[in-house]
């Protein structure tokens, strides 16, 4: 999956959205409903009413990128439906995108060394 930098912020809209929306419709939803800025490089993940579909929207510096995925034989594991957004780390997002249960994924804690040895 092509994505912006490794340290990207990933937000999942927990409420299903109308999947007829394209780039502009989803960007407007990010601003009006999620109260976020769509042109910051943040990755926004949207779900359809059917749990087997997702859309991803992010700004890559020169334009809005939108990806759509439909699973053939299973459904995505989604958070409980409620108003708002939730944050995923990169490892959890990759598990979600692969159709795996992202709730079982924990990223390793990374920290910058204080000094070279």
Regions found by a protein language model. Name each.
Residues 1-117:
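Polybasic/polar functional segments that serve as interface/processing modules
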């Amino acid at each position: 999956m092509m994505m912006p930098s490794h340290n990207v912020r990933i937000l999942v809209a927990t409420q299903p959205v109308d999947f007829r929306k394209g780039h502009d419709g989803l960007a407007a939803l990010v601003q009006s409903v999620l109260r976020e800025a769509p042109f910051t490089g943040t990755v926004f993940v949207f779900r359809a009413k059917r749990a087997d579909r997702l859309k991803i929207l992010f700004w890559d510096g020169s334009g809005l990128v939108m990806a759509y995925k439909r699973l053939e034989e299973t459904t995505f594991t989604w958070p409980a439906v409620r108003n708002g957004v939730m944050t995923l780390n990169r490892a959890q997002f990759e598990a979600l995108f692969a159709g795996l249960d992202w709730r079982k994924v924990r990223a390793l804690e990374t920290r910058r060394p204080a000094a070279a040895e």
